[in-house]
């Protein structure tokens, strides 16, 4: 296991373009998490399998906690919690809504599509939190890094759970007849 050294930031670093970028990326993921709080109930309702429905409902509770954690992060770095529209998450959410619109109710095929959309969201969040944690450490924001590390671990677990559910959903969907 490799370790990453964290070099505390100087006063200059905290007033740098890197600091500005860090705050913009926090605003981006803050918007994304808030969007998911609104979207996950729709995904849960559209899910065919009870296991997938429960996974989305459980992750909704975690996502609400992620929003709260981000508010703590903003506070810990002396910034007010503001959002900046996350175009990546907006696109992923739109794709998920299209899947719901374009698939039949109560089918495993819909679940497969919802899992794809869910995992795309998770992977975006995993990448974003991974980068933000390193920036926080570089800038000397250890409390922010700890808060986001807890969120990152939950995102990884949610992704793993979706991967597990996909195995049975994919098999079930492969048995559904093709509609003409």
Task: List each language-model region with its residue ranges.
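Amphipathic alpha-helical hairpins
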Residues: 1-180
């Amino acid at each position: 296991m490799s370790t990453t050294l964290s070099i505390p930031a100087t006063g200059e670093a905290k007033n740098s373009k890197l600091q500005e970028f860090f705050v913009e990326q926090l605003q981006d993921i803050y918007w994304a998490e808030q969007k998911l709080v609104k979207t996950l109930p729709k995904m849960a309702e559209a899910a065919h399998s009870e296991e997938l429905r429960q996974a989305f409902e459980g992750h909704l509770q975690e996502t609400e906690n992620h929003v709260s954690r981000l508010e703590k992060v903003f506070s810990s770095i002396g910034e007010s919690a503001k959002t900046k529209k996350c175009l990546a998450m907006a696109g992923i959410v739109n794709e998920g809504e299209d899947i719901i619109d374009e698939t039949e109710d109560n089918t495993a095929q819909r679940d497969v599509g919802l899992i794809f959309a869910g995992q795309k969201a998770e992977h975006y969040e995993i990448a974003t939190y991974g980068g933000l944690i390193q920036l926080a450490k570089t800038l000397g924001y250890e409390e922010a890094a700890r808060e986001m590390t807890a969120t990152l671990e939950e995102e990884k677990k949610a992704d793993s759970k979706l991967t597990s559910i996909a195995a049975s959903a994919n098999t079930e969907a492969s048995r559904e007849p093709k509609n003409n």
